[in-house]
Regions:
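N-terminal signal-anchor module of multipass membrane proteins
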Residues: 1-122, 126
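Structural signature of hydrophobic alpha-helical transmembrane segments
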Residues: 115-129, 166-175, 256-266
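Long hydrophobic alpha-helical segments that form multi-pass transmembrane helix bundles
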Residues: 188-270
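Hydrophobic alpha-helical transmembrane segments
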Residues: 57, 61, 123-127, 150-154, ...
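C-terminal ends of transmembrane helices
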Residues: 41-47, 132-144, 181-191, 271-280
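Hydrophobic, membrane-inserted alpha-helices
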Residues: 131-137, 152-161, 176-183, 267-275, ...
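A generic, well-ordered mixed alpha/beta core segment in the N-terminal half of proteins
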Residues: 149-220
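Alpha-helical transmembrane segments
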Residues: 278-302
Length: 302
C-alpha cells in the first residue's frame, strides 16, 4: 500500500505537462514491476486474460533458468579442471582472489566450487549487457515517448548465454548496443523488427571479432588452454572422432563440454522448452516447423 501511495504521489510529475514528462517511460517501467498496468484496450476485440506482455516475458526469462544454472556449473567445471593442476601461488586475478578469500577450492568434483567459479564469469557479462543495452532501451523510449519494453530482459539473457566466458566486457557492451539499435530500434522498436536483437548482437561480434568468438582458445577462461568444441571436432573429423577426444553422447547431452556459457546442455534447453510448452507460451507447431525446416535445408546444403 505504501508503494502505491508513493507512485501515485509522484505520477503527476511524469505525466504530460509535468516537469519530468520526458522520463515517463522510466517511471512506467518501474511502476509496472510492482503493479499491473492500467492500460486497457478501447476497441474490440477484447482479450480477457491475466497474461500480458510482462507476464509472457517473465515466463520466458524463467525458462532460461536451467541454462543459467548450467552455465554456472559447466563454466566453473571447465575452468577448475585445469586450475586444479596449477600451483595456487601461480594464479592471479580478482576471481581467484575472491575464491581464495572465501576458501572455495578449485575442485572440479565440487558442485558448489564449480557453481561459484562459473557465476563469477556469468554475472559480469550479464550486468554489462543489462547496463549497456538498458541505456539504449531507455534512450529510445524517452525519445519516442513509448514504454520500455520487457522484451529486453529476454534479449539480455539470451545474448549473455550465447557468449564465451572469455568475452571482454567492452565487446559485450558493443555487441548488445549493436543488437538493440540495428536489430530492433531502426525498425521502430518491439513488434516492428524482424531481427532478433540478441542474435543480431552475437552475429555482429562473430563477424567483427572472429578470434574472440570462435577457435580453440576462447572456450576455457584459463590462459594458455586450448580446447575445441564438439561441433568443431565433428565438422573437421566427423562425429565418430568425438570418442577419441573423450566426449561421449551423455557428455554432449548433459553439456559437460566446451562451448558458450549457456549453449552446451541439451537437457537444460529441453527443460526450458518443456516449461514454455506447459505454460502455453510457446506453440509446439512453430517449434516442429522450425526444426523441420532447419533439418531439411541443412541436409540440402550439406
Amino acid at each position: 500500500m505504501a508503494f502505491r501511495k508513493f507512485f501515485d504521489s509522484i505520477e503527476p510529475d511524469f505525466k504530460a505537462g509535468g516537469k519530468y514528462e520526458k522520463l515517463y517511460p522510466i517511471y512506467e517501467m518501474v511502476e509496472t514491476i510492482f503493479y499491473t498496468s492500467s492500460t486497457v484496450t478501447k476497441a474490440a476485440p477484447h482479450a480477457r486474460s491475466f497474461v500480458d506482455m510482462k507476464r509472457i516475458m517473465t515466463y520466458v526469462v524463467i525458462s532460461t533458468i536451467p541454462c543459467i544454472l548450467w552455465a554456472f556449473y559447466n563454466t566453473g567445471l571447465q575452468t577448475n579442471i585445469y586450475l586444479s593442476e596449477i600451483n595456487s601461488s601461480e594464479l592471479n586475478g580478482w576471481r581467484i582472489w575472491l575464491l581464495q578469500l572465501f576458501g572455495i577450492p578449485f575442485n572440479p568434483n565440487s558442485i558448489f566450487a564449480n557453481m561459484a567459479h562459473g557465476a563469477l564469469y556469468f554475472f559480469p557479462i550479464y550486468i554489462t549487457t543489462l547496463v549497456a543495452g538498458g541505456v539504449c532501451e531507455v534512450f529510445f523510449a524517452t525519445k519516442r515517448g513509448h514504454e520500455v519494453n520487457e522484451g529486453f530482459l529476454v534479449s539480455s539473457m539470451l545474448y549473455t548465454l550465447t557468449l564465451p566466458a572469455t568475452t571482454p566486457l567492452w565487446m559485450v557492451a558493443l555487441g548488445i548496443i549493436f543488437g538493440v539499435i540495428v536489430g530492433k530500434e531502426v525498425f521502430g522498436g518491439t513488434g516492428k523488427n524482424f531481427l532478433n536483437p540478441a542474435l543480431t548482437g552475437r552475429a555482429f561480434l562473430y563477424f567483427a571479432y572472429p578470434a574472440y568468438m570462435s577457435g580453440d582458445s576462447v572456450w576455457v577462461p584459463v590462459d594458455g588452454v586450448t580446447s575445441a568444441t564438439s561441433l568443431s571436432i565433428s565438422a573437421a573429423e566427423g562425429y565418430q572422432s568425438l570418442i577419441s577426444y573423450g566426449i561421449t553422447w551423455s557428455d554432449a547431452f548433459l553439456g559437460t563440454i566446451q562451448g558458450s556459457l549457456g549453449e552446451t546442455s541439451t537437457l537444460a534447453c529441453l527443460i526450458g522448452l518443456a516449461f514454455l510448452l506447459v505454460t502455453r507460451i510457446a506453440n509446439y507447431r512453430l517449434i516442429i516447423g522450425c526444426l523441420a525446416g532447419m533439418i531439411v535445408f541443412s541436409s540440402f546444403l550439406n
